[in-house]
């Protein structure tokens, strides 16, 4: 889907250099169709980098997507210019009366922080509750999965002893599900987290459909039967060098990290890694947009679909 973004957003030139179709707001006004409204709650510190990653995955389809970037942390950012945040992000109070076709909640580097110590935890609770009445389908990614499972299902925070980092093999458990349509029987996907998502824990606490899992990484992709919420515990949006950057960052911080699994050639961090997960990342987001958002959402967002009640 050509994503519809402000003309001045840095992602426009960045993604066009990759031959990704980006439609600016000025051009979109000439097309007489209703774009899908997708809200992106960006919790990552390097917001511009994260914008580029998610907008790339949202861009590959003929329908328009009107992207609205959302922030909830009022503290001064160390990694993103204030001017960028002020120009391209809205506060929750600006949109709380609106309805959206989709909501994406990104990960956050909070794997070792208790929920009660997360500065914006009350805002997370508020937005997840708000989404039940104002969003057709919500996609949670990595840390946001752990937060949502706690808020929606009462699942306690599960933390691994060592960080799960690298490229892991996954098996498609339900190949006929809409969200996994077109998936290979096995495929690779990146993980970078302390959070633990055992399949047995999800089966104990929820009736969520577990669609993809990994012997090493646990549950990867699961969703509610009504398609209102979907969860991906890895990072299909990651650039080829994102894990390398995280590894070097942790080395510099003296954390003695393990080298990301199945990532650097011959486990040699001096060699450039190669991406092996992009196609399934694109397919996952395309399926979510099509089957969980576009096929269900009402044409007039002022009247949310009664099946969502």
UniProtKB/Swiss-Prot annotation:
The active site is at 142 (acyl-thioester intermediate), 235 (proton acceptor), 237. GO terms for cellular component: cytoplasm. Keywords: Acyltransferase, Amino-acid biosynthesis, Cytoplasm, Methionine biosynthesis, Transferase. The record marks 192 as: Important for substrate specificity. Pathway: Amino-acid biosynthesis; L-methionine biosynthesis via de novo pathway; O-succinyl-L-homoserine from L-homoserine: step 1/1. It is an enzyme of class 2 (transferase). One of its GO terms (molecular function) is homoserine O-succinyltransferase activity. Its EC number is 2.3.1.46. GO terms for biological process: L-methionine biosynthetic process from homoserine via O-succinyl-L-homoserine and cystathionine. SUPFAM superfamilies: Class I glutamine amidotransferase-like. The keyword Cytoplasm applies. It catalyses: L-homoserine + succinyl-CoA = O-succinyl-L-homoserine + CoA. It comes from the Bacteria. Substrate binds at residues 163, 192, 249. It is found in: Cytoplasm. The keyword Transferase applies. Belongs to the MetA family. Transfers a succinyl group from succinyl-CoA to L-homoserine, forming succinyl-L-homoserine. This is Homoserine O-succinyltransferase. The gene is metAS.
């Amino acid at each position: 889907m050509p994503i519809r973004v402000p003309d001045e957003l840095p992602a426009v030139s960045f993604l066009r250099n990759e031959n990704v179709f980006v439609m600016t707001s000025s051009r979109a006004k000439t097309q007489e169709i209703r774009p899908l409204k997708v809200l992106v709650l960006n919790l990552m510190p390097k917001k511009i980098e994260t914008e580029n990653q998610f907008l790339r995955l949202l861009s590959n389809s003929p329908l328009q997507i009107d992207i609205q970037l959302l922030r909830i942390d009022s503290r001064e950012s160390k990694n993103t210019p204030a001017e960028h945040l002020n120009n391209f992000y809205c506060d929750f109070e600006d949109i709380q009366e609106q309805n959206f076709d989709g909501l994406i909640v990104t990960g956050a580097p909070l794997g070792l922080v208790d929920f009660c110590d997360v500065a914006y935890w009350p805002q997370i609770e508020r937005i997840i509750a708000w989404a039940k009445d104002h969003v057709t389908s919500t996609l949670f990614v990595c840390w946001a999965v752990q937060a949502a499972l706690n808020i929606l299902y009462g699942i306690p925070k599960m933390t691994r002893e060592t960080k799960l980092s690298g490229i892991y093999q996954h098996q498609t458990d339900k190949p006929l599900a809409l969200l996994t349509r077109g998936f290979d029987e096995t495929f690779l996907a990146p993980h970078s987290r302390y959070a633990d998502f055992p399949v047995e824990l999800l089966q104990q606490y929820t009736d969520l459909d577990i669609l993809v899992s990994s012997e090493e990484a646990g549950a990867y992709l699961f969703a509610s039967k009504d398609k209102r919420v979907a969860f991906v515990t890895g990072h299909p949006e990651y650039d080829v060098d994102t894990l390398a950057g995280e590894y070097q960052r942790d080395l510099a911080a003296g954390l003695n990290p393990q080298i990301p699994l199945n990532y650097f050639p011959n486990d040699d961090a001096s060699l450039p890694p190669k991406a092996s997960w992009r196609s399934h990342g694109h397919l996952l987001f395309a399926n979510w947009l099509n089957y969980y958002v576009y096929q269900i959402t009402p044409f007039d967002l002022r009247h949310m679909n009664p099946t969502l009640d």
